[in-house]
């Protein structure tokens, strides 16, 4: 099995958001329907991950495009404030599979059920802007798995949870020409 030269993933952060507003913006000339969602929530590190993060969102915006035959395109930006007063910029971009379960949650259907972790086969990439003891987040890249949960209150559109893993270099290849193990 080829292993050298491939990245590894380290569980790092969990971001739990409550989407409280979804604003329709209209059809795009390139296809799809554009909307903006606003959310609030918490960003925390998993046990053993450094830096330790315990933050609450100040503001989160997600400009998303819904394609009838394809996945949703997500593009979220926002700010979180840590429990020690540091502000961290957050950016996420990626896809959300347009499955029947996702459609039911997005349409706020009463029979909608939460998606299971691993059920959605698309992911998002995450980057951060931070300083001080959180500055190492700025030089890292993260990928996230997504879980959606339906609304349970009038002031909630849906819930979206992300499990972020930091992308790290995999083992180096030891052969002289740098190709590593043959595929």
Question: Where in this protein do the model-derived segments appear?
Answer:
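Beta-strand-enriched cores of mature, soluble protein domains
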Residues: 2-183
């Amino acid at each position: 099995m080829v292993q050298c030269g491939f990245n590894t993933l380290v569980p790092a952060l969990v971001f739990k958001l409550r989407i409280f507003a979804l604003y329709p913006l209209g059809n795009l000339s390139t296809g799809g329907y554009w909307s903006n969602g606003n959310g609030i929530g918490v960003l925390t590190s998993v046990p053993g991950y450094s830096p330790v993060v315990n933050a609450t969102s100040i503001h989160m915006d997600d400009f998303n495009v819904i394609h009838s035959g394809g996945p949703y395109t997500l593009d979220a930006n926002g700010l979180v404030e840590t429990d020690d007063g540091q502000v961290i910029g957050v950016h996420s971009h990626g896809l959300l599979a347009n499955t029947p379960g996702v459609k039911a949650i997005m349409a706020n259907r009463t029979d909608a059920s939460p998606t299971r972790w691993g059920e959605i086969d698309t992911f998002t990439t995450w980057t951060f802007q931070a300083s001080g003891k959180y500055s190492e987040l700025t030089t890292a890249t993260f990928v996230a798995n997504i879980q959606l949960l339906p609304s349970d209150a009038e002031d909630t559109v849906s819930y979206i949870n992300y499990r972020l893993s930091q992308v790290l270099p995999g083992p180096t290849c030891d052969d002289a020409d740098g190709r590593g193990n043959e595929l």
